[in-house]
C-alpha cells in the first residue's frame, strides 16, 4: 500500500487539534463535576420521560457542555483524516454498513434487555444464543463487531455485558424502534439507490418515484403503503428485494382477517424514539413558556411524541395532534392511555385527522409545529392559508450546514470543519435516507429560505439548539398578508368553528393583537 508524505502544516494542525481537545476535555470534566442528578427522580425509558422537571441535567447537557462535547467528537473525525492511512480509511468506511446491521440484530433480538439482568458479569454467548435463536459462533462475531465500536462490552472469551451505550436500549421500545426503522425498508431502498439514480426517474423529486418503490415492489407513496392492510403472506413481499421483518410470529390479524403492516407501528414508535434523542432540546431551547396558554398544532405529529415531551413542562399550553387516521388510532388506543390519559380526559390534548397537503382546518393557531416530515411548497402554502397575523410555523428539522460553512450558523472553532464535520454524520445519513424513500431533502439555510419564499412566507429566525436538529421559525411574508389575515380573523371564533369545546375565540397572543389593532 502506498503511503503519502505529511507536511509541516499537517503536523501543526494535529497539534492544534490536540490543544483544542485538551481545552474541551477540561470543560467537559468541569461540567460533569457540576451536574447534580440527585434531585431528579430516576426515570424509565417511557415515552414521556424526557420532561417533568426544569432541572435538565438528566435530559440535556448545559450549553457549555454541549459545545465542548461536539467539539471533541468533531476532533475525532478531523484527527482521523490527518493520521489515518488513506487506503485504510477508505476500506474502513466501505464496510461500515455491517456495524448498523449488527446493531439491528442485537436490538431486534433484545440482547440489551437480556444482558440487563445479568449484571456486570454478563452472559456467555451460549446463553445469549439460546435466548435469541441465533447460532452462537455467528452471534459471537456480531457482538465482537459491536464491542469494537464500543457498543456492548466483552469481559472474557465469548462472554458479553452491556456498557453505557448498549444499556440505552434496555427496555427502551422507542429507541429500539428507531434502530429498526433504518434497518427495515429504508436500507433496502438504499440498496436500490445507485441503480435508481441512473434510471429515467433519477432526477425526479416525486414521492412515488424513488428507490424505495423499487425496493418494496409498489407504485404507491410510502405513507400509502404503510397504511395498507394485507394478508400474512404479503407482510413479507415475495416479488421485491425487501425481505420484511425477520420474525413475524407475534403479529395478530384484525377483525377483517388482515394484518396491519408492522412497519407502520414501528414507524410511529420510532418517531418518538428519534424525538427523544434529537428533540429533547426543542422543549427547552425555544421560549415555550412565553406563549402563555397558546394553541400548538402538531401537524403530521404521528402518535404525539413531541406533545408528550412538552406537556409536563408546559401544561398551560393547548395541543392538537394531527395525522392520518391509522396513526391517530395507534396514538389513542396504545400510547396516550398509558402515557398521559389525564391530558386527553381534561381536553388539553385532542386529536384530529388531517392530510397536511390540504389547508389546515385549525385557523389562527399560535404555533403550527412540523417535525420530521417531508417539507415542500404545497405543505407550507396550505398552512399559510390558515395563519393569523401572529401565527408562526416552527419547522423542527436538520438545518444543514456544510463543511464550508454559511452566514446563518456559527462555525466550529478552527481548525475543525465549519459544520463540526464528523459530529454531523447522522444528519447527512438521514438526508440520504430521505432521498431514498420519499425524495425528501434536508436543507441548508439558503434552501430553507428559498422554499419558504416560494410558499409566500418568510424565515423569521433559525433557533440553534442543543441538538443536531434546529428550529426554523416561519411567518407571513409581508404586511399586506398580515393585514389581510387580521381582517379575516376579526370577529370569528377561530377554534370554536371546529366544534372543539375547550378552544375559545381567538385566544392568547392572537386575540391580544387583534384587540390592540381595533383599539388603535
From Swiss-Prot:
It holds the Pfam family Methyltransf_2. This is O-methyltransferase cicE. Pathway: Phytotoxin biosynthesis. Disruption phenotype: Abolishes the production of cichorine. Belongs to the class I-like SAM-binding methyltransferase superfamily. Cation-independent O-methyltransferase family. Cichorine and its derivatives are promising in the course of developing novel herbicides. GO terms for molecular function: O-methyltransferase activity; protein dimerization activity. S-adenosyl-L-methionine binds at residues 300-301, 323, 355-356, 371. O-methyltransferase; part of the gene cluster that mediates the biosynthesis of cichorine, a phytotoxin active against knapweed, corn, and soybeans. The first step in the pathway is performed by the non-reducing polyketide synthase pkbA that condenses one acetyl-CoA starter unit with 3 malonyl-CoA units. PkbA also catalyzes one methylation step to produce 3-methylorsellinate. The nonribosomal peptide synthase-like protein cicB, the cytochrome P450 monooxygenase cicH and the O-methyltransferase cicE are involved in the conversion of 3-methylorsellinate into nidulol. GO terms for biological process: cichorine biosynthetic process; methylation. Its EC number is 2.1.1.-. Keywords: Methyltransferase, S-adenosyl-L-methionine, Transferase. It comes from Emericella nidulans (strain FGSC A4 / ATCC 38163 / CBS 112.46 / NRRL 194 / M139).
Amino acid at each position: 500500500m502506498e503511503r503519502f508524505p505529511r507536511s509541516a502544516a499537517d503536523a501543526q494542525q494535529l497539534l492544534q487539534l490536540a490543544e483544542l481537545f485538551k481545552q474541551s476535555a477540561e470543560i467537559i470534566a468541569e461540567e460533569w463535576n457540576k451536574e447534580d442528578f440527585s434531585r431528579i427522580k430516576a426515570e424509565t425509558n417511557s415515552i414521556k420521560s424526557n420532561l417533568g422537571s426544569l432541572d435538565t441535567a438528566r435530559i440535556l447537557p448545559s450549553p457549555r457542555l454541549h459545545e465542548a462535547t461536539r467539539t471533541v467528537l468533531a476532533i475525532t473525525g478531523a484527527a482521523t483524516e490527518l493520521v489515518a492511512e488513506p487506503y485504510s480509511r477508505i476500506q474502513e468506511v466501505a464496510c461500515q454498513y455491517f456495524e448498523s446491521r449488527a446493531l439491528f440484530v442485537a436490538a431486534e433480538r433484545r440482547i440489551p434487555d437480556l444482558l440487563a439482568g445479568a449484571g456486570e458479569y454478563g452472559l456467555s454467548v451460549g446463553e445469549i444464543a439460546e435466548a435469541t435463536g441465533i447460532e452462537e459462533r455467528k452471534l459471537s462475531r456480531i457482538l465482537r463487531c459491536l464491542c469494537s465500536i464500543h457498543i456492548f462490552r466483552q469481559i472474557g472469551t465469548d462472554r458479553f455485558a452491556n456498557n453505557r451505550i448498549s444499556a440505552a436500549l434496555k427496555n427502551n421500545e422507542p429507541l429500539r424502534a428507531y434502530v429498526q426503522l433504518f434497518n427495515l425498508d429504508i436500507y433496502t431502498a438504499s440498496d436500490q439507490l445507485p441503480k435508481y439514480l441512473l434510471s429515467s426517474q433519477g432526477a425526479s423529486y416525486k414521492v412515488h418515484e424513488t428507490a424505495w418503490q423499487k425496493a418494496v415492489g409498489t407504485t404507491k407513496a410510502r405513507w400509502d403503503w404503510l397504511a395498507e392492510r394485507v394478508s400474512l403472506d404479503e407482510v413479507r413481499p415475495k416479488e421485491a428485494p425487501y425481505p420484511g421483518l425477520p420474525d413475524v410470529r407475534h403479529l395478530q390479524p384484525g377483525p377483517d382477517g388482515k394484518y396491519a403492516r408492522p412497519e407502520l407501528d414501528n414507524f410511529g414508535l420510532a418517531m418518538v424514539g428519534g424525538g427523544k434523542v434529537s428533540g429533547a432540546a426543542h422543549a427547552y431551547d425555544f421560549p415555550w413558556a412565553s406563549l402563555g396558554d397558546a394553541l400548538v398544532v402538531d401537524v403530521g405529529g404521528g402518535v404525539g411524541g413531541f406533545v408528550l415531551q412538552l406537556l409536563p413542562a408546559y401544561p398551560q399550553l393547548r395541543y392538537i395532534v394531527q395525522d392520518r387516521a391509522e396513526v391517530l388510532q395507534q396514538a389513542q388506543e396504545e400510547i396516550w392511555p398509558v402515557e398521559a390519559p389525564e391530558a386527553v380526559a381534561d381536553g388539553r390534548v385532542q386529536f384530529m385527522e388531517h392530510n397536511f397537503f390540504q389547508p389546515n382546518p385549525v385557523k389562527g393557531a399560535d404555533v403550527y409545529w412540523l417535525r420530521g416530515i417531508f417539507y415542500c411548497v404545497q405543505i407550507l402554502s396550505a398552512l399559510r392559508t390558515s395563519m393569523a397575523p401572529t401565527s408562526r410555523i416552527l419547522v423542527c428539522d436538520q438545518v444543514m450546514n456544510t463543511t464550508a460553512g454559511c452566514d446563518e450558523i456559527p462555525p466550529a472553532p478552527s481548525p475543525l470543519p465549519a459544520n463540526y464535520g464528523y459530529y454531523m454524520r447522522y444528519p447527512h445519513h438521514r438526508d440520504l435516507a430521505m432521498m431514498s424513500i420519499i425524495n425528501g431533502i434536508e436543507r441548508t439555510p439558503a434552501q430553507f429560505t428559498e422554499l419558504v419564499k416560494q410558499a409566500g412566507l418568510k424565515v423569521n429566525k433559525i433557533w440553534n439548539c442543543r441538538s443536531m436538529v434546529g428550529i426554523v421559525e416561519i411567518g407571513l411574508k409581508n404586511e399586506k398578508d398580515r393585514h389581510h389575515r387580521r381582517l379575516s380573523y376579526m370577529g370569528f371564533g377561530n377554534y370554536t368553528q371546529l366544534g372543539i369545546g375547550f378552544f375559545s375565540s381567538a385566544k392568547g397572543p392572537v386575540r391580544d393583537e387583534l384587540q390592540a389593532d381595533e383599539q388603535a
